[in-house]
């Protein structure tokens, strides 16, 4: 069974975008390509257990096993050696991507304290949107009692849109709560 947002895209979002931007081909209509979740764990240098906890939390949030990222260069001031594990990332595609986006928009973002909408200035100029989450506790899968420290994560929504305006409209159609 296809995801709710995947069905929503086919039935309402794609036709609305085609009409608004006057696309001639259905292949011109922007769509979400992938969602990348990245959790940098800088304190993993001193305590490797912190990285294991971050990987476990990212697995719960995304529903798939994260890739552990390694340092590209050694930085003496940070006591960092090349090749040390310093974070984790997950790339979501297909139904998992749509399920995560639905959960993010309808469950997690409304749980953010003093939430007034996400910034409209976080587009990169090529139709991709980046969102920073300050604490992982907004996700319903994370048990508040089992968390020993709050960690943030970056969420990058990669679209096939050519411009920021097209990407903003695409995400708005999906229900992304942009700040006025």
Curated annotation (Swiss-Prot):
Keyword rRNA-binding: yes
InterPro entries: Ribosomal_uL5 (IPR002132), Ribosomal_uL5_bac-type (IPR020930), Ribosomal_uL5_C (IPR031309), Ribosomal_uL5_CS (IPR020929), Ribosomal_uL5_dom_sf (IPR022803), Ribosomal_uL5_N (IPR031310)
Family: Belongs to the universal ribosomal protein uL5 family.
Keyword Chloroplast: no
A single cellular component GO annotation: ribosome
Function as written in the Swiss-Prot or TrEMBL entry: This is one of the proteins that bind and probably mediate the attachment of the 5S RNA into the large ribosomal subunit, where it forms part of the central protuberance. In the 70S ribosome it contacts protein S13 of the 30S subunit (bridge B1b), connecting the 2 subunits; this bridge is implicated in subunit movement. Contacts the P site tRNA; the 5S rRNA and some of its associated proteins might help stabilize positioning of ribosome-bound tRNAs.
Listed name of the protein: Large ribosomal subunit protein uL5
GO BP: translation
Subunit record text: Part of the 50S ribosomal subunit; part of the 5S rRNA/L5/L18/L25 subcomplex. Contacts the 5S rRNA and the P site tRNA. Forms a bridge to the 30S subunit in the 70S ribosome.
Cross-referenced Pfam families: Ribosomal_L5 (PF00281), Ribosomal_L5_C (PF00673)
One of the record's GO molecular function terms: structural constituent of ribosome
PROSITE patterns: RIBOSOMAL_L5
